[in-house]
Every structure is written in C-alpha cells, then in structure tokens.
Amino acid sequence: MRRIIKILVVVAVLYLAIIFLFANTRRVVPIHRQTPFPPTHPADLKIHDPSILKVGDKYYSYSVGPRIVIHEAPTLSGPWKKTGHVLDKDSIIPKGDRKAPWAPTTIEVAGTYYCYYAVSQSGCRNSAIGVATSQSPGPGGWTDHGAIIHTGTGPGSDSAPFDRSNAIDASVILTPDGNGYLNFGSYWTGIWQVPLNADLVSISDVSTNAARHLAYEPHAFSPGGKNPNPLCGDRSGSHPIEGAFVSYRAPFYYLWFSWGKCCKYNPKALPPRGKEYQIRVGRSTHPQGPFVDRQGVDLIEGGGEVVYGSNRDVYAPGGQGVLTDEGTDILYYHYLNKTVSLDFWEARLGYNPLIYIDGWPVAQ
C-alpha cells in the first residue's frame, strides 16, 4: 500500500511540474508568417503589377503593357473590360522600355488623376520614374510630364540616393496634411522615399532632397554577377525586395512590399519554398518611417510581416496595393494559378479584405 502511495505522489509531482513548466514557457510566435493564408478572391482579369481606383460606382485598373493599359469594371471581381491606355504614344522619357511602361500607380487628388510609371530595362537600374496627369480616370486626355527622377543615367542620377537605387515601382502616399511622398526601388539597395513638391510631378533639388531609406533585404539570394555594364546586375548579389506601397489607417502608415523571387518561373526549377514572391508589411507612425515589423525589426534590417503568400492554387502573389472601399481596406495583387500556368502574362488579379488585429493587417 505504501509503495502505491509513493508511486501516486511521484506521478502527482511530475504532473504539477509539467503544468508549471508550460505555464512559465513563453509561447513562441513564428516570425514573418501568417498561416494559413485565406483563399484569394479571384477576378476575371489577367494583369501584372495592378493599380486600382474606385471612382463613383466603377473600378479602374492600370497595369504594365503598351502605353499603360486601362481596364474598367462594376466590381472588383469583374467583369473587367479593356477601355484604352493612359499614354497616347510612347513615354517621352528617352530610356528603357518606353513603349510599355512598368508598374504604374494612379492616385486622385482634388479632381486630378496622377499616373506614376517607370521605364527601365530588365536586370538593370538605368531607369526613370515619370508621371502623367488627367482630369478623368479613363483613357484620353492624359498629359505626359516625363521624368521625376532618374537612376543609372540622366539628370540627378549621380546624387544620393539615385546613384545606388533603381527608379522603378513607384507609389505615392499623400498625408492628411497634404504632403506627398514618392516611394520607389527594386533590388540593389531596396526601397527609398523622397518628398514631392506641391505639384506632385516634381521633387526639389536632389542634392538637398530629404531622402529616406525605408526597406532592404540584406541577405543576397544569389552570388553577384560579373556583367561588364556596371548598371546591370548587382555585384553584391540579388536582394529581392521591391513594389513599395504605403497605406494609412490611423494611427499607422503601412509600408507594403513584395519580397522574394519574382517572375520568369521555371516549373521544373522553382525557387525553394518560401523564397518566391510574397507580400510583406511594416508600420510606422510617420510616413517617412522608420518602419518595423511585429517583432520590432526595422525593414532596413530585413524585417517584414508576411500578410499573404502562396497557398492552394495561388503562387507568388505580389505587386500589391491597398484600396479603401466603403471603409474597408482591400489588399489587391497579382498572382499565378499553379493549375493554369506560371507564365508572366498569365498573372491575374486577386484580392482580400483586411482586418486589423492589434494594429496589424490580416487578410480575410
């Protein structure tokens, strides 16, 4: 009997010890991962690097393609219809792919529409960001103002930060007090920001401009290249971060970006799982940062909270933006459907409403 009692006592002590151990062990929260991701809300639109506005009861999308393609739809899901182009001829910026400008972002301010776009050459940072304006969101009536900034070559390209960055993937955040900031950057030294003048189509003298470094991926995904052209191929290696977009929901500004390998996927040699395109975010109480993730890691140090990534048939979502529609923030992006094709031009529009938990966006 005493032996049985001793055994029961030992068991009870062990049980209590286990409870105490778990009660005093901090729950480990995985960094950079929100799992599982919800399914996408698909749309009937093939698109890459979308920019979406809602004007009245109609949605407008702007995307890479000849002279910047415009589509219109009654709902985000569609049906989407191509209605024309932003530019009526090639960009007036004399460099890069002038016929099909990249990654446009369109905003509306006081009845004027501003479409920011990039001209560049794949794998090189001989790039520029330009802007066109119109009094209407649809095709026709746009004025091309040309370049705001240059990298690689062109006016101001030898001044910091343009001497080390890549002027593509433009977006603009307009603060409640009316100040505009141009966000840009891809690979190389990551994402940068410069303040715009009040006209929103120019910046101050670059030699005195108050530029901010917002985000960077410090770890190279691949070795540096040996391209004889110093503007093509980063000799420090591939640092895949791009596609900056800043949204605001009081009291925070949110810096969204695409991280990981983008585009030109070989189905037989895909990047390691988790290294493909995904959508990350950091936040700040100031539009110029510093931006940090949930763990407090500065985005310049490689921080970033994953909000949406590959799941189910969705592969490599990115090129994102945030649209506020009837009080709800909606994360939209392009993605590839693994059951259809991984070809660049098979990317399609997807979206997810956002909720905020402890001030952090969560895709629904």
Curated annotation (Swiss-Prot):
Top-level taxon in the UniProt lineage:
Eukaryota
- Main subcellular location of this protein, as a coarse class: secreted
Give the record's pathway: Glycan metabolism; L-arabinan degradation
Name the Enzyme Commission number(s) assigned to this protein.
3.2.1.99
**What family, per the record?**
Belongs to the glycosyl hydrolase 43 family.
List the active site: D49 (proton acceptor), E242 (proton donor)
Q: Which UniProt keywords apply?
A: Carbohydrate metabolism, Glycoprotein, Glycosidase, Hydrolase, Polysaccharide degradation, Secreted, Signal, Xylan degradation
List the GO terms this entry assigns under cellular component, sorted alphabetically. extracellular region
This chain belongs to which protein, by name?
Probable arabinan endo-1,5-alpha-L-arabinosidase B
> Which GO molecular-function terms appear in the entry?
arabinan endo-1,5-alpha-L-arabinosidase activity
Q: Where in the cell is it found?
A: Secreted
Q: Which InterPro entries match?
A: GH43_arabinanases, Glyco_hydro_43, Glyco_hydro_43_endo_a_Ara-ase, Glyco_hydro_beta-prop_sf
Reaction catalyzed: Endohydrolysis of (1->5)-alpha-arabinofuranosidic linkages in (1->5)-arabinans
- Report the leader peptide range: 1-25
Please list the GO biological process terms of this entry. arabinan catabolic process; xylan catabolic process
Name the glycosylated positions: N337
- Per UniProt, the enzyme's principal EC class comes to hydrolase
Q: Where is this site: Important for catalytic activity, responsible for pKa modulation of the active site Glu and correct orientation of both the proton donor and substrate?
A: D169
Q: What does this protein do?
A: Endo-1,5-alpha-L-arabinanase involved in degradation of pectin. Its preferred substrate is linear 1,5-alpha-L-arabinan.
One of the Pfam families matching this protein, by short name: Glyco_hydro_43
